[in-house]
From Swiss-Prot:
GO molecular function: DNA binding; NAD binding; NAD+ poly-ADP-ribosyltransferase activity; NAD+-protein-aspartate ADP-ribosyltransferase activity; NAD+-protein-glutamate ADP-ribosyltransferase activity; nucleotidyltransferase activity; zinc ion binding
Name by which UniProt lists this protein: Poly [ADP-ribose] polymerase 1
Main location: nucleus
Catalytic activity: NAD(+) + (ADP-D-ribosyl)n-acceptor = nicotinamide + (ADP-D-ribosyl)n+1-acceptor + H(+); L-aspartyl-[protein] + NAD(+) = 4-O-(ADP-D-ribosyl)-L-aspartyl-[protein] + nicotinamide; L-glutamyl-[protein] + NAD(+) = 5-O-(ADP-D-ribosyl)-L-glutamyl-[protein] + nicotinamide
Enzyme class, first EC level, given as a word: transferase
Residues reported to bind Zn(2+) 2: 329, 332, 348, 358
Activity control mechanisms: Inhibited by N-(6-oxo-5,6-dihydrophenanthridin-2-yl)-N,N-dimethylacetamide HCl (PJ34), 1,5-dihydroxyisoquinoline (DHQ) and 3-aminobenzamide (3AB).
Binding sites annotated in the UniProt record for Zn(2+) 1: 22, 25, 54, 57
Localization annotation: Nucleus
Family: Belongs to the ARTD/PARP family.
SUPFAM superfamilies for the chain: ADP-ribosylation (SSF56399), Domain of poly(ADP-ribose) polymerase (SSF47587), Glucocorticoid receptor-like (DNA-binding domain) (SSF57716), WGR domain-like (SSF142921)
Lineage per the UniProt record: Eukaryota, Metazoa, Ecdysozoa, Nematoda, Chromadorea
């Protein structure tokens, strides 16, 4: 079982100091005073924070109907004195059952109408009646009046008259039979008592029988019962159609008594356990801290670290002293077993892998006896203290099964969401609703570019500092760290920069941290007068957070529970030069070519395209993640894909690889818990995201410098510079020419039956990529002009590098016929891969594809260049709807254009029906592809039917 380590929403304890103040009354909470907290997400770090209250002030803060609480949602109950545990349970019971006065209009009347009262079943025997103060029986009927829960008998005593029968009580049928019998008897007695109290004022001629409307018990014939005595149980049960009621009632009473005895025994044992725990606590609290640590070490137990280690040391000593010492974890072999008050169970402190905690848990693990050395026994006079008195920890069953209440967490704020940080995606899933506000890449609200480096704008002196460089190798003293753990709902970043003043010999080690995609976080800095001290501090912080040495970061190894180093590429910022030329103002390129170049190299367009993938663009300067980092992420997806085909699915390893992926490619989930990558659909989405990142990185690298030296680009329009970098000639087709008309006809004729689509043809550019024609394998024949759709942001990479096959690191899952380049003979099929919105332009390619001999397949099959059967050069996935061959056009350049009207093929081949709606053509060698046309269309509407 994978347990969640998310903090519980509430906590209770005896104040460990006298320094905290109550959040309600603002007064001091004294040392050892009982206090409660509301645990909510912090605004200062990626985690939760306790807001403490006096015990009574906490319950004033809680509002019925808005807040919910139960024992399972409170941390620390196990460590309270027994009387305080009982006090807490009664308070919770009162909070849950009591009703506001405004909801009990009966309190000001002397007549109770049974059909309008509020009742419920007592969930335990701990609650007490608001009138007589006696405990309820478990399962007993409780009636509410004036905000208090009463016995049904006590409730009836509050009124002068009773209107209705017990069967009128809402939910009457849901109560247990023995308590219904008891309630009927109490009801009859109450009626008789009220009648006797009014008898002196009753005329002699009046009937002694209550009015029919107030008679609760019916005879077997259905007539009112005239006797004033409590009716026999057999008569009452007979009303409900029960058979042999005496025997049934006896058995139920016997069972109830047995359960009550067992509950009483369990309660006494729990009290004993609590008293012993508290006795041991008092012993260990008197010891010096060094002696406590010595005892833990003697018993081969871990020494707690982190927040409030002293309290954790005492709790572990107390637990071990009473029950014995848990042995080392047998699941991961590197962690110790400790009691977790939030989970109400024992968990492992170790890590199964460098990315995931061990998921071991047990209510009562295997233990060894707890021992104290002779020296410490003599020193603290422990000779008369008996340890290891209980072999198993006891739990209250009904509380152990309760679910933790759900609390509305504070949601991610909009705008520029906190600290600048490099991360790739919002959630990149169909359920994410976190809004994205696209900011300006060069805005000082995000970062400041100084001397080819990016200075964190949160630093107060950022405008007069730059990132310090190593004088030997030129590397920058800055690090971006990431940590994601789904079980703890952690999605953290940590940034370190060593900054130098532009003018003076002043150095600053600046740190910022928080939760990715939110304003949660903080920052700090230290000042130094020389570089050596600053470098040592920078290296110390890096080692503290990662347990790796800075000088060996190129061989970084992720350590369990520590941050991971996110490898980033800042080289493009060193090449950015200011230009006074407005892009497009001086170029002599044709208008349509200029528009395409400006579009595919426009940073804002890249951001808008990334937004469609729900990627965050405010804190990810484009191109920052390195190729190596992206390839590592591909490998993780491949590992997850391999896990999903093996049954049963290993949920722990899925969790581990998900943590690893989100750590390598930081995502923004806001305050939501990161989702495991546990399906092929999610793998495909993440795979598409990584491919998009590669294309954007290529485009931005071209913008930042590419192959054109900055010295030769002075005075040249940026559009011309970027066009040269593409090394792809683009020539607009004359509207109305033969090729234009032919392509327009191809576009109109090949709309799929399942696609509701309306587009407008804007422009067609003829393409000629540098050296592509010379490599093109036209000799294998069977050339066709086929469609290929892609997001606009990918076109700088496509035009500059050609269409490419997915890298070896990418998973095979998501590709119906293996890793290759996919084409279609249906315009509408390829169009949906463009991810365009209404009124936006989309770009599609028409490619001359040398198919050669085609292997035709009816269903999915993993194919590669190496596994293609001998004599075949491509694969065709056969679809039901396709263009008629009779309408194809043989172009003078040597390829066929399948622009015929489409038709439905009614019968499959070789007795196998069609799995695909439309044809797919796949080649596994990029030299079988030659880009011919870029088609610009404007979308009016598009949807799948």
């Amino acid at each position: 079982m994978i347990h969640s380590n998310e903090p519980l929403p509430y906590a209770i304890e005896y104040a460990k100091s006298g320094r905290s103040n109550c959040k309600t009354c603002k007064k001091n909470i004294a040392l050892d005073q009982l206090r409660m907290s509301m645990n909510r997400p912090s605004t200062f770090f990626d985690g939760n924070m306790d807001s403490w209250f006096h015990y009574n002030c906490f319950w004033i803060k809680m509002i019925r109907g808005r807040d919910d609480i139960n024992i399972s949602s409170i941390r620390g109950v196990d460590w309270l004195r027994w009387e305080d545990q009982e006090k807490l349970r009664q308070e919770i019971q009162h909070f849950k059952t009591a009703s506001p006065p405004t909801l009990t209009p009966l309190c000001s009347t002397t007549t109770v109408i049974l059909s309008t009262i509020k009742t419920e079943k007592s969930l335990s025997n701990r609650g007490k009646c608001g009138k007589c103060g006696q405990n309820f029986e478990r399962g007993e009927i409780k009636a509410h009046n004036k905000g208090k829960a009463n016995h049904f008998k006590c409730f009836l005593q509050e009124f002068d008259k009773i209107s209705g029968t017990v069967e009128d009580i809402p939910g009457w049928a849901d109560y247990e039979e023995n308590f219904k019998i008891k309630a009927v008897g109490e009801y009859v007695e109450a009626l008789a008592a009220k009648r006797r109290s009014t008898e002196p004022a009753t005329p002699a001629s009046a009937s002694p029988t209550p009015p029919e409307a107030e008679t609760p018990v019916l005879s077997a014939e259905g007539s009112p019962e005239s006797s004033n005595k409590r009716p026999a149980s057999s008569e009452i049960i007979e009303i409900d159609g029960e058979g042999n009621p005496d025997e049934n009632d006896f058995a139920k009473k016997r069972r109830m008594k047995k359960e009550a005895r067992l509950m009483e025994v369990q309660k006494k044992r729990m009290k004993k356990q609590s008293d012993l725990l508290w006795e041991y606590r008092q012993i260990f609290e008197r010891m010096p801290y060094t002696d406590k640590i010595s005892i833990l070490r003697e018993n081969e137990q871990d020494i707690p670290e982190g927040h409030d280690p002293t309290a954790q040391v005492i709790e572990r000593l107390v637990d071990n002293a009473l029950f014995g010492c848990p042995i080392i974890c047998q699941t991961c072999s590197n962690g110790k077993i400790v009691y977790n008050s939030s989970c109400r169970t024992y968990v492992c402190t170790g890590y199964a892998t460098e990315y995931s905690k061990c998921t071991y848990e047990s209510k009562n693990p295997i233990r060894t006896p707890f021992e104290v050395s002779h020296r410490l026994t003599e020193k603290h006079k422990l000779q008369d203290i008996v340890f290891n008195q209980m072999s198993e920890r006891l739990y209250i069953g009904e509380e152990d099964g309760e679910s933790v209440v759900k609390i509305d967490k504070r949601k991610s704020k909009g705008g520029t969401r906190g600290e600048q940080f490099i991360y790739a995606a919002e959630a990149f899933d169909s359920t994410n609703n976190v809004p994205i506000k696209v900011g300006d890449l060069t805005s000082t609200n995000t970062h400041i570019i100084k001397k080819g480096t990016v200075v964190d704008a949160k630093f107060a002196l950022a405008d007069r500092c730059h990132v310090f460089k190593n004088e030997i190798d030129g590397s920058l003293y800055q690090a971006t760290l990431s940590f994601t753990d789904l079980t703890q709902n952690k999605n953290s970043y940590y940034k370190i920069q060593l900054l130098k003043d532009d003018q003076r010999e002043n150095y600053y080690v600046f740190r910022s941290w928080g939760r990715v995609g939110t304003e949660v976080g903080g920052n700090k800095h230290e000042s130094y007068s020389n570089s050596n001290e600053a470098i040592l501090k920078f290296q110390d912080v890096f080692h503290e957070k990662t347990k790796n040495d800075w000088i060996y970061r190129k061989h970084f190894r992720k350590m369990p529970g520590m941050f991971s180093y996110v490898e980033t590429d800042y080289s493009e910022f060193a090449q950015i030069t200011d230009t006074e030329i407005t892009p497009g103002s001086k170029t002599l390129l044709p208008k349509s070519v200029k528009e395409v170049v400006m579009s595919i190299f426009d940073v804002e367009n890249m951001k808008s395209a990334l937004k469609s993938f729900e990627m965050d663009v405010n804190k990810m300067p484009l191109g920052r993640l390195s190729h190596n980092q992206i390839n590592l992420a591909f490998e993780v997806l491949n590992d997850i894909s391999d896990l999903l085909v093996k049954l049963p699915i290993d949920a722990s390893r899925i969790l581990d690889f998900s943590n690893k992926f989100y750590t390598i490619i930081p995502h923004n989930f806001g305050m939501r818990v990161p989702e495991p990558i546990d399906s092929f659909h999610k793998i495909k989405e993440k795979n598409n995201m990584l491919n998009a990142l590669l294309d954007i990185k290529f485009a931005y690298d071209q913008i930042s410098g590419g192959d054109v030296p900055a010295s030769t680009s002075l005075g040249i329009d940026p559009v011309d510079i970027n066009y040269q970098k593409l090394k792809c000639i683009m020539e607009p087709l004359q509207q109305g020419c033969d090729d234009w008309n032919m392509i327009h006809q191809y576009l109109k004729n090949t709309h799929g039956a399942t696609h509701d689509l309306k587009v407008e043809l804007i422009d067609i550019l003829k393409l000629n990529r540098d050296n592509e024609s010379s490599k093109f394998k036209r000799h294998i024949g069977n050339r066709r002009l086929l469609w290929h759709g892609s997001g606009k942001m990918n076109f700088a990479g496509i035009l500059g590098q050609g269409l490419r096959i997915a890298p070896p690191e990418a998973p095979v899952s998501g590709y119906m016929f293996g890793k290759g380049v996919y084409f279609a003979d249906m315009f509408s099929k390829s169009f949906f891969y463009c991810r365009a919105n209404a009124k936006e332009e989309a770009y599609l390619l028409l490619c001359d594809v040398a198919l050669g001999n085609v292997q035709q397949l009816m269903a999915s099959k993993n194919v590669s260049r190496q596994t293609l059967p001998a004599g075949f050069q491509s694969v065709q996935g056969l679809g039901r709807q396709c263009p008629r061959e009779i309408g194809s056009y043989n172009h003078p350049d040597g390829y066929t254009i399948p622009l015929g009207l489409t038709y439905m093929q009614l019968q499959g081949k070789q007795d196998v029906d069609y799995h695909l709606l439309y044809n797919e053509f796949i080649v596994y060698d990029v030299d079988q592809i030659q880009l011919k046309y870029l088609v610009r269309v404007k979308m009016h509407h598009a949807r799948h039917l």
